[in-house]
A protein has these predicted regions:
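Catalytic phosphate/metal-binding cores of nucleic-acid and nucleotide-processing enzymes, i.e., regions
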Residues: 1-118
Length: 118
């Protein structure tokens, strides 16, 4: 059975899949061999490096996950935390990255899991 977080990942995969070969993505797995705290999804998106941490509901990244996302930002990449309610916002951000390719990433990790008012 799919977990709530895996449903968020699936939606993010689908967003990137719309861009075909212009969005090369991998899903790092640790399994004792990789680096703990790596983002759920790492993408080369039209030449831009993007790390995406997917969360369900009000879930927040661990301290190690935030450290890794901040490292991506310091290296010049983009880093986002996305949940099921912010996938649409993330889609708009991807469009913005394409429309303004020379605009540098934000100086902080973009946590898109903020509370939405119903």
């Amino acid at each position: 059975m799919a977990t709530p977080e895996s449903k968020v990942k699936k939606k993010v995969y689908e967003l990137f899949d719309e861009y075909g070969e212009n969005a090369y993505r991998i899903t790092p797995t640790t399994g004792g061999y990789g680096s703990s705290g790596a983002p759920d999804i790492v993408v080369c998106f039209f030449g831009k490096y993007i790390g995406v941490e997917c969360k369900a509901g009000k879930g927040k990244p661990t301290a190690l996950q935030m450290k890794n996302l901040k490292s991506i930002m310091k290296a010049g990449g983009y880093a986002y935390v996305v949940n099921e309610r912010s996938v649409g916002v993330f889609s708009l951000i991807l469009s913005g990255i394409l429309s303004k390719p020379n605009v540098p990433p934000q100086p902080e990790v973009s946590d898109l899991t903020y509370e939405f008012e119903d």
